[in-house]
Amino acid sequence: MNAPEILNGAATASPADATEATQTAARAKTPLTRREQKEAYENNKLFKRLARQVGEAIVDFNMIENGDKVMVCLSGGKDSYAMLEILMRLRERAPINFDIVAVNLDQKQPGFPEHVLPEYLKQLDIPFHIENQDTYSIVKRLVPEGKTTCSLCSRLRRGILYRVAGELGATKIALGHHRDDILQTLLLNMFYGGKLKGMPPKLQSDDGKNIVIRPLAYVKETDLEKYAELREFPIIPCNLCGSQPNLKRAEMKALVRDWEKRFPGRIENMFNALSNVVPSHLMDHKLFPFAGLRATGEADPQGDIAFDEEPCSTDAAEGAMPGATKSISIVQFDDL
């Protein structure tokens, strides 16, 4: 996509006409109270921020191209609802043509409200497909009682969605993972997997046949929570299967939330670090040729300053005011 055009579209888009209070007042031709005006302003600002961030992610990673058919995976949770609505709004103003089809996988979990998503999608007047597959029975049969079923369930779901994408002729599969999901995955892999690995905004599927995109990659979960409350999405609970929660991921989520609250700027810096990788200062010899490294006798502006204190830019440092900079010593001579 063309960056200026789609981002301009994001800036001018607005939610389904802000809040109920705004709509009611407009119909009645009565002036808004100061509180209602403030709420309408904040809600509109929230949508513009979400649309801008989604537009930026699409542009930065070339997620959607002219002629694409994007299969939006709709689970019934706040993230996928918001993703679908924002993509629909951006499409109205995008400089390219692309189609959207919403897909939900009904896994036959007990108590799953089968009517909710079809009714909602019919109101949106958007093409959709409900795939009925009883993966619930398979998972319950194979996973011991009390164990987390999420891993097997996700593998089954992934295979089904890849197949459905092929049947529908989808060229991109859109998932609703957001910024916090990406950081939680990074921490999980570091703490429990021994890998410096996150969750990419765009990837080729493991079967080699699909391109998976995450348009919400730049979006904070707290913003999605506010937006879902504003839009009153018909949220479907994610615990219908009765599985035990993923305690490790819950731990990472709590950690990220705590850091963001207590140390303003820390989480944003962590997220920015994913886009500013320096392989020569890590330890993966597959990414950098340490074995063949030799002194050339010529100055290298990118060379290491091993005996100096390395300054950190802290424009968004913990507790710092925007625009402030401060040098933080991260290498002490006692450590050398």
UniProtKB/Swiss-Prot annotation:
Binding-site positions, [4Fe-4S] cluster: 150, 153, 241
Annotated Gene Ontology cellular component terms: cytoplasm
Keyword Nucleus part of the UniProt annotation: no
InterPro entries: Rossmann-like_a/b/a_fold (IPR014729), TilS/TtcA_N (IPR011063), tRNA_Cyd_32_2_STrfase (IPR012089)
Cofactor field: Mg(2+); [4Fe-4S] cluster
Family affiliation: Belongs to the TtcA family.
Its job: Catalyzes the ATP-dependent 2-thiolation of cytidine in position 32 of tRNA, to form 2-thiocytidine (s(2)C32). The sulfur atoms are provided by the cysteine/cysteine desulfurase (IscS) system.
Annotated protein name in UniProt: tRNA-cytidine(32) 2-sulfurtransferase
Lineage: Bacteria, Pseudomonadati, Pseudomonadota, Betaproteobacteria, Burkholderiales
